[in-house]
């Protein structure tokens, strides 16, 4: 009888532990099997938490999540982002990002000038989420993403009062 009780206790303990670390269900990007995404994924071991939110398991290749409930989702393997005049392009920690804030308080940040692209979906709600600056300012996360070589970078946009510089004439 003690063996049966011990086995039941082990099963119960395993169930409790499994309940504490639920897997985040995500879909892999089309290019998730790119070897550069594997390089990023391996280096995400150096990012155990972001803004106080612990990393969680995901069920899709080249993805990651932080927080319970998840406040940061990462997907590697998207097509390289094209230049745009509608999205803000920012640089932080050596990585350029296109920022889509059309679904506030959620932000979608996609690397610019890297192939394949990495995308972050961030709950930026001050009450329940995490600061986007804490996410993209995380040095270990930036170092992981920077393993994908940059081919383009953000350029400064002229302000509304900028005067165009005339091109030289011959």
Feature-to-residue mapping (PLM):
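Bacterial N-terminal signal peptides that target proteins for export
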Residues: 1-8
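Extracytosolic low-complexity repeat regions of secreted or lipid-anchored proteins
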Residues: 86-170
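Secreted/processed peptides and extracellular or luminal domains of membrane proteins
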Residues: 26, 43-44, 82, 95, ...
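N-terminal secretory signal peptides
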Residues: 25-77
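Mature extracytoplasmic or organellar-lumen-exposed domains after removal of signal/transit peptides
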Residues: 79-81, 116
């Amino acid at each position: 009888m003690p063996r049966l009780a011990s086995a039941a206790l082990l099963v119960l303990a395993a169930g409790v532990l499994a309940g504490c670390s639920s897997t985040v269900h995500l879909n892999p990007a089309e290019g998730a099997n790119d070897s550069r995404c594997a390089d990023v994924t391996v280096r995400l071991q150096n990012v155990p938490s972001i803004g106080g939110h612990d990393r969680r398991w995901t069920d899709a290749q080249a993805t990651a999540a932080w927080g319970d409930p998840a406040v940061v989702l990462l997907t590697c393997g998207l097509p390289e982002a094209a230049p745009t005049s509608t999205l803000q392009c920012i640089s932080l920690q050596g990585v350029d990002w296109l920022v889509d804030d059309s679904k506030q308080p959620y932000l979608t940040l996609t690397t610019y000038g890297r192939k394949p692209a990495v995308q972050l979906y961030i709950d930026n709600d001050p009450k329940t989420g995490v600061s986007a600056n804490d996410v993209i300012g995380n040095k270990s996360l930036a170092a992981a993403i920077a393993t994908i070589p940059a081919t383009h970078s953000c350029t400064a946009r002229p302000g509304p009062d900028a005067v165009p510089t005339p091109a030289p004439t011959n």
